[in-house]
């Protein structure tokens, strides 16, 4: 896999659990999808969720937001059990927001219209809604494309709009499902920096990001979790993972390094 250059110098010190999965298992049509999945994402942390395509990363996200109910196990937010809390309540009452792998944009709506559509759902006060949308357009450097339909935006622009949409509700837990997929190197580096900046600005938010490739994700992660064969095979800081022989043999390969 080669050498990865660190983007984020970790100053993360907190040990406050924000969202936890405890012994989650799931099967579908008698086929085991996930088995005994347990991990915690802490306040202020960027945590990576790594694993090959089809291993269940998106399924874990769907369980976390309440779209899928596990066969066994529980989900906790701020150490409160939310396993039976419906999806809309997890979003509005517990501050869970997701940037889906597909982006979640309405292709025939402009950047501004996409933001407004979500803003009208999550921000009731009109003046506050207008202010937040304008702030997101500025923060994500979308002014030049705000009136362009989403289907005409570049991959990097679409990702920035999708993240801006997810942040309108001021989430305490931000999930990003493969945000670097389909981006060129420059767009990936820009998005990495954007994510790091967001966490630096708000150290109370927990951020969980999935990817199948370690290179881009470990560069910004404080910790990471590796999935393989339905289970977690390792979790820890990037340095700890690279010292784990099981993680190296199953996932990284012997030549992978963090610079």
Residue ranges and their predicted role:
Residues 127-145, 193-196:
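Conserved ABC ATPase "signature" region
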Residues 174-178:
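Catalytic Walker B motif of ABC-type/P-loop ATPase nucleotide-binding domains
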Residues 50-52:
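The feature captures the beta-strand-to-loop junction immediately N-terminal to the Walker
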Residues 65:
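Helix-to-loop junction immediately C-terminal to a conserved catalytic motif
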Residues 149-153:
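Conserved ABC ATPase signature
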Residues 19-21, 34:
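Conserved structural motif at the start of ABC-family nucleotide-binding domains
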């Amino acid at each position: 896999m080669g050498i990865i250059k660190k983007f984020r110098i970790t100053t993360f010190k907190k040990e406050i659990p924000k969202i936890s999965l405890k012994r989650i298992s799931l099967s579908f049509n008698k086929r085991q999808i996930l088995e005994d999945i347990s991990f915690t994402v802490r306040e202020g942390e960027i945590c990576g969720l790594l694993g090959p395509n089809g291993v269940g990363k998106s399924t874990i996200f769907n369980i976390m937001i309440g779209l899928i109910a596990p066969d066994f196990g529980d989900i906790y937010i701020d150490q409160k059990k939310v396993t039976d809390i419906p999806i809309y309540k997890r979003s509005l009452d517990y501050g869970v927001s997701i940037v889906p792998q597909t982006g979640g944009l309405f292709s025939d709506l402009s950047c501004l219209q996409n933001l407004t559509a979500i803003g009208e759902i999550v921000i009731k006060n009109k003046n506050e809604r207008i202010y937040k949308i304008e702030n997101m357009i500025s923060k994500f450097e979308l002014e030049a494309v705000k009136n362009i339909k989403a289907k005409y935006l570049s991959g990097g622009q679409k990702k920035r709009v999708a993240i801006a949409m997810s942040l309108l509700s001021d989430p305490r837990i931000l999930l990003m499902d493969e945000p670097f997929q389909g981006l060129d190197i420059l767009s990936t580096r820009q998005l990495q920096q954007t994510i790091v900046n967001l966490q630096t600005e708000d150290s109370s938010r927990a951020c969980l990001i999935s990817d199948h490739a370690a290179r881009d994700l470990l560069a910004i992660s404080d910790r990471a979790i590796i999935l393989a064969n339905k289970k977690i095979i390792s979790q820890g800081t990037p340095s700890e993972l690279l010292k784990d022989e099981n993680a190296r043999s199953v996932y990284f390969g012997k030549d992978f390094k963090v610079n």
